[in-house]
């Protein structure tokens, strides 16, 4: 296909138009008085959202050159979302501010490579200063504050704080759609996996149709148990001790299953058999997790272990096990805290190294099950459209809260970026005149989020920013109440990781845009090159 090429000023101008179209759409959502954007879908009702990355991803411009500019800004938002889970609108506003100011200087004759060096120098200094002024998250109230600011809802903030308190900071918190209109939290403690009993005759509670085992032994194996003789010595020892048994195996079939059921019905001993969770390598990893959690050993040919040689001290133990037809929950595993902590660190490293979203999700699930449980926030709303919008907001709030736990928090409402600007202005220098220009561009851009929040609240952004530059650290403009106050004390806080990621990604994409000298895009198809239309049979085709 033929290509169209634009150079220097023409190229940058086309990219800037795309940047502005996307950023002007996204930035209307910033702050407590930001508006919503309606997104058309190919079918069904349109989506209504104020989630920056969702809006950015949905924008596709007709002009190829402008679309490239828009897609680059969208990438800054997407990267921020991937790293911190929030801050996408801030990243978009910062990108636009740096690009606009940079383009003016490049047009006036400044060298874009020098400007880029200055942008990188100033961004590094700003990030270092952000870390210096960051507060660590230590209480449940602080977690609730972060979540409340991100979701614009105290109710959601408290729900997320409750969930984190119950399952720990590493625990998995999933967000599901509720069938009702209320948003509520439920928590599954301990390790749960989606495999139920192999026979309903194993239940101990006929009303609930579930099997409860108190202080059971747990046999963990990746083998199939078909011959009862393989585990008979083990069963005899367990019966002598008057204990119950949970069997987690590849499968239990042949004569083994009916023999176990018969002994259960006769009251010889309490036993429940379930299939091992997962498939392939993931199954092996999950069985190893269960073994570490319960202090047992996986009886596997990979380790040279056979069922018939299994000793009772190779079995795991737990305080309580509950098995339904669909799931097994192990609570109070008897594994050593050191072994569990070591396994948790190992999984965290795998999460950091993986490039697959699916693998990351599965690893996080395993991490949560080892770290203490799974919390489920069920989102309710009156309509499908409202439900989707609430779900987006709660997901953002959850991501923001995790980010705050990781790197701490700073004053919200764009105040921290202006505080950083005040601290480093005059101390950060470029190594040339053009680099110095790059430093000044970043300094000016740091005030862009505050300006936009004020404008979305119907105020003059320049006036608010000027006032803020003369205020004490952490004192900012609360757009929700139209007051000047200490943002941290008022509970208006942003995760440091979110603010940092937004600035770093904005500076990175903006610097690339400014140093662009040529843009190549598909040439628009000419009408004369298109195939002629088929003749209409109803026009002059009669005999």
UniProtKB/Swiss-Prot annotation:
One of its GO terms (biological process) is protein refolding. It catalyses: ATP + H2O + a folded polypeptide = ADP + phosphate + an unfolded polypeptide. GO terms for molecular function: ATP binding; ATP-dependent protein folding chaperone; host cell surface binding; isomerase activity; unfolded protein binding. GO terms for cellular component: cell surface; cytoplasm. Its EC number is 5.6.1.7. InterPro entries: Chaperonin_Cpn60_CS, Cpn60/GroEL, Cpn60/GroEL/TCP-1, GroEL-like_apical_dom_sf, GROEL-like_equatorial_sf, TCP-1-like_intermed_sf. The keyword Nucleotide-binding applies. It holds the Pfam family Cpn60_TCP1. ATP binds at residues 29-32, 86-90, 413, 478-480, 494. Signal peptide: none annotated. Keywords: ATP-binding, Chaperone, Cytoplasm, Isomerase, Nucleotide-binding. It is found in: Cytoplasm. It is an enzyme of class 5 (isomerase). NCBIfam families: GroEL (TIGR02348), PRK00013.1 (NF000592), PRK12849.1 (NF009487), PRK12850.1 (NF009488), PRK12851.1 (NF009489). Belongs to the chaperonin (HSP60) family. Together with its co-chaperonin GroES, plays an essential role in assisting protein folding. The GroEL-GroES system forms a nano-cage that allows encapsulation of the non-native substrate proteins and provides a physical environment optimized to promote and accelerate protein folding. Forms a cylinder of 14 subunits composed of two heptameric rings stacked back-to-back. Interacts with the co-chaperonin GroES. This is Chaperonin GroEL. It comes from Lactobacillus johnsonii (strain CNCM I-12250 / La1 / NCC 533). The gene is groEL.
